[in-house]
Regions:
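Bacterial N-terminal signal peptides that target proteins for export
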Residues: 2-15
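Carbohydrate-interacting regions of secretory-pathway proteins
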Residues: 26-224
Length: 224
């Protein structure tokens, strides 16, 4: 009888141990959180600039009166400030013949949720998405005129809490951009004077910011 009792206790202990091991494996930890929002593997020819876990390679941009910039749920979250809030790439970045893709989402606010400042040769320009009250898309600046006033300006409705895929392409004589596959910019840059507004100058050479708006960014990748 004692042998049967001992065997029974050993069996119960064995299954209890298995249960505890399984329970431990299910406990959340930082590396297993939010698996559904981790960056996808970059397509051939593309390099991921954001790992979905840290700001490695990035610095929070030194704007005046910014909100916070940090990684939340596998994305870079830019909290609303009293001006621009953003991140700037801190490593080498091409000046010409490259493409950038990313996904951006507006969380709250009424101005641009994604402003990409980028090099074009020795000049710089910014792609503004959702500016001037929310609908304006365009390049700032072209021949001294910002995105609301120059030939690249267009209007597009952006829903809050919705992801938009933004694709920027810079070549020797053209700047192009697409949002969710729809081309919104097709500018022949020959003979054009490209510049940026002074308030986004800290984003140089390559940075992404919002203006008095909370937004989030993910799957930032580069092709050159």
């Amino acid at each position: 009888m004692s042998n049967i009792k001992s065997s029974f206790i050993q069996t119960v202990s064995f299954f209890a141990a298995l249960f505890l091991i399984g329970l431990t494996a299910c406990v959340d930890n930082p590396k297993s959180k939010n698996r559904d929002v981790k960056p996808r593997s970059a397509d051939p020819g593309w390099v991921l600039l954001f790992d979905g876990e840290t700001l490695d390679g990035w610095v929070v941009t030194n704007f005046v009166l910014p909100g916070t910039g940090e990684v939340v749920d596998g994305a870079i979250q830019l909290e609303m400030g009293d001006g621009c809030t953003g991140v700037t790439w801190g490593d080498d970045f091409p000046k010409m013949e490259y493409e950038v893709k990313l996904e951006a989402k507006k969380l709250s606010g009424n101005d641009f949720f994604c402003g990409i400042t980028f090099p074009v040769g020795d000049s710089f320009c910014s792609l503004i998405v959702g500016g001037w009250g929310g609908p304006v898309v365009g390049l700032s600046n072209i021949d001294g005129y910002d995105a609301s006033e120059n030939e690249t300006s267009s209007l597009k409705k952006f829903e809050p809490d919705s992801w938009y895929t933004i694709h920027l392409k810079v070549s020797s004589d053209k700047i192009e951009a697409w949002i969710d596959g729809e081309q919104v910019i097709n500018l022949d840059t020959r003979g054009k004077q490209l510049s940026i507004r002074s308030d986004v100058a800290p984003s140089k050479p390559f940075g992404i910011c919002s203006w008095r708006t909370s937004s989030t960014l993910r799957n930032i990748r580069l092709k050159k």
